């Protein structure tokens, strides 16, 4: 169990606008990782990077926990992992993630991250993931709450 806060971020629909990429679903069904590479950031990433780095300096652990495509085989999973890591390196180059997990679609993210209570925060657009997180007493939020939560943590609240 950790005493330091752990902030876990989904990617698709949370920080990466996958669903706005043209023909994203057809591409994934064709085993193309292109939409993951082309997704636009969903917020001001200069400000987000500053907030994440400030939180990390205060001891917050930063984790990515993201699903791979529903249609997936081991080769495509590896392609997705690479595309997501490259996306993070391109869009948030100053952020040094403590962990990056790209897991099979539908995996319980709370179990992957070892949620053991309210020091574990999840930012995810998927209600099911937030519900599973809260079942283990973690704190789960919509993506729209990222900025305010980070500001509060960085102010020491």
Language model region names:
Residues 2-87, 91:
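Alpha-helical substrate-recognition element adjacent to the catalytic core
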Residues 5, 98, 120:
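Conserved acidic residues
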Residues 24, 126-132, 140-152:
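Short glycine/proline-centered loop/turn elements that form peptide/ligand docking sites
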Residues 62, 120, 138-141:
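Hydrophobic anchor at the start of a short beta-strand
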Residues 65-70, 98-108:
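Acidic carboxylate-rich catalytic motifs and surrounding loops in phosphoryl-/glycosyl-chemistry enzymes
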Residues 96, 135-137:
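Short, structured coil segments at secondary-structure junctions
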Residues 101-128, 133:
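Conserved Lys-Pro-Asp/Glu-containing loop-to-beta segment of HAD-superfamily phosphomonoesterases
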Residues 110-116, 150-157:
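Short amphipathic alpha-helix with an adjacent loop that forms part of the alpha/beta core around
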């Amino acid at each position: 169990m950790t005493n330091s806060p752990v902030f876990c971020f989904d990617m698709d629909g949370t920080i990466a606008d996958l669903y706005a990429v043209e023909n994203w679903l057809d591409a994934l069904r064709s085993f193309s990782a292109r939409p993951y590479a082309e997704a636009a950031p969903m917020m001001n990433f200069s400000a987000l990077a500053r907030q994440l780095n400030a939180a990390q300096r205060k001891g917050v652990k930063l984790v990515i926990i993201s699903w791979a495509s529903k249609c997936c085989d081991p080769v495509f999973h590896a392609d997705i992992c690479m595309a997501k890591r490259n996306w993070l390196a391109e869009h948030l180059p100053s952020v040094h993630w403590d962990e990056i997990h790209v897991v099979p679609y539908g995996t319980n993210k709370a179990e992957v991250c070892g949620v053991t209570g309210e020091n574990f925060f999840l930012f995810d657009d998927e209600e099911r993931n937030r519900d599973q997180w809260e079942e283990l007493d973690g704190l789960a939020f919509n993506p729209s709450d990222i900025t305010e939560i980070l500001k509060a943590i960085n102010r020491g609240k």
